[in-house]
Amino acid sequence: LEIRMNASTGRIQPDISAESTVSAPPKKTQIIAIYGKGGIGKSFTLANLSFMMAEQGKRVLLIGCDPKSDTTSLLFGGKSCPTIIETSAKKKAAGEVVTIGDVCFKRDGVFAMELGGPEVGRGCGGRGIIHGFELLDKLGFQDWDFDYVLLDFLGDVVCGGFGLPIARDLCQKVIVVASNDLQSLYVANNVCSAVDYFRNLGGNVGVAGMVINKDDGTGEAQAFCDVVGIPILAAIPADDDIRRKSANYEIIGTAASQWGGLFEALGIAVAEAPPVRPKPLTQDGLLGLFKGEAVGRGVELAPASFADMCGVTYVEKPSLEVVYEGA
């Protein structure tokens, strides 16, 4: 599924020719995919960002594209949205048709939905994402009119379904959420590698920048962005007040919050940041951002032997050779 914008109406128009890579005309709607390591704070960032954008008078659609289906829980005070895939299956079994009101919900100007996915061990999450976008098309996605469509994607998985926005130019730009730790920057680097790869194939998606979440001031994420060539859109501090409010499903991306200015600035940065082609790091380059003792750079690879694998002293036994007369 490829989404383009109709130049005359400024609205989203789907093109389900998966192989086409035609450059899209200028778009009114900014479609932005957010990637990051599981648990890094993508949903927290997006819920507060979308709320602030709505306060700024923008029309915002937030779509959770993670099988955990927890993107919208903070926005709705801990309540879970019925997912598109689950609702579609139930409606189909009952001989009914899915309507927008079955799967899309709103709060203070933010519209939100969850694509969902299969139950654990019972299907392919990436395929579920593709199927979810097909269902969105049937719901009239091409006629919806938003200033921003924010897609919350899992970043740990390299499956093509989760890479759909990058591979098929579904979005104009990507934002990565990370922190000052190796694991989250490893995922961010993988996302940058995917963007760079599809740019080589003629794609148009670029990285708009990084949001540093739980920033402890150690600087590894800043160093990563400097080397890869992407800007920092915001640095959300590792603050106990933020942690408590997030745990209590309290929105802080509002002008009434002491953190409102942070998300107001993030909203402006997200809107204005151009998509750029990143320069992903090698594994050694990524490890080089950290102190040697933190990543074990003094360790050498020692080859294992068959005897090691058997766990006992191994004595090679001679084989029985069979000799045939006249051979």
Predicted feature locations:
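Short acidic, glycine/serine/threonine-rich loops at helix termini
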Residues: 45, 72-75, 162-163, 188, ...
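Short secondary-structure boundary/capping segments
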Residues: 24, 101-105, 166
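C-terminal lobe/tail of nucleotide-utilizing enzymes
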Residues: 2-26, 197-327
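Conserved catalytic-core segment of NTP-binding enzymes
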Residues: 55, 138-148, 153-238, 243-244
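Extreme N-terminal, non-catalytic leader segments
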Residues: 1-40, 44-59
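Helical mechanochemical/support elements of P-loop NTPase systems and associated helical scaffolds
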Residues: 67, 125-128, 132, 158, ...
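Nucleotide-state-sensitive switch-loop elements of NTP-binding domains
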Residues: 29-32, 55, 59, 65-153, ...
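Solvent-exposed alpha-helical segments within well-ordered globular domains of core cellular machineries
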Residues: 51, 69, 111, 130, ...
